[in-house]
Amino acid sequence: MRKTAEGAHLGTPRRIAGLRVVMSWPDSEFTPAPARPGAFRARLAAVAGAVLLAGGAITIAVALLAQQHAPQPSAAAAGATGPAAKGPSLHRSLPVSVDIPAIGVHSQLLHLGVTADGSIQVPSLTRSADEAAWFKYSATPGQIGASVIEGHVDSYQGPAVFFRLGALRPGDTIDVTLADGVTAIFRVTGVRQYLKEKFPAKTIYSAADYAALRLITCGGTFDYATGHYLSSTVVFASLTSSRGPGGPEKSS
């Protein structure tokens, strides 16, 4: 396992459609960085310990810790990784923003690619913890193929853009606004969690025969000994309809 300069935790290199893909996840041991995944809870844990030593109200600190656990996907939310039937698709247009009403997310979208060593870039924790990023070597949202958007779950400042991603359920909607003014409307088909050493990169990043969307963040248990999450949460969604600028919703 390796780390990027941004503190990304890297897995086994893979090649997908000629692209060398090294799965990366935000890590908590890079320097210098005032923000990192899970570190907010780690800092609260330190505060809790200090309160305990002082004989103070430890229950308050424990309550704060409990409140900062990101929602995890339930077995009922696993659903499917794709739709039952092929749906509509859109022409290529770069994504501008993403909205997820069920979990209160609105974010402008960064466009990120790969680093010099071929690993997938992640948003900067120091500057962009509250912004999601579209992987620019994936399909644009609404195109036939898999479009990938990633975001951090938390940082030193607390919950980040995809903190509540694991709370999504099949049927929830995801709206991606495109540069041409069209909004691509996706419906969640499933939410799954994978141990990072078993992350199915081919399933997530390889081409699909329908307009697919994948949202990715860290999830599962936070390992305080190593300073990173043990799993990744992945939301699978498919395009169901779209709206034009000022126009009605359409399904094709």
Task: Tell me the role of every PLM-derived stretch.
Residues T59-L168, L178-V182, G190-S252:
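Solvent-exposed, non-transmembrane regions of membrane-associated and secreted proteins
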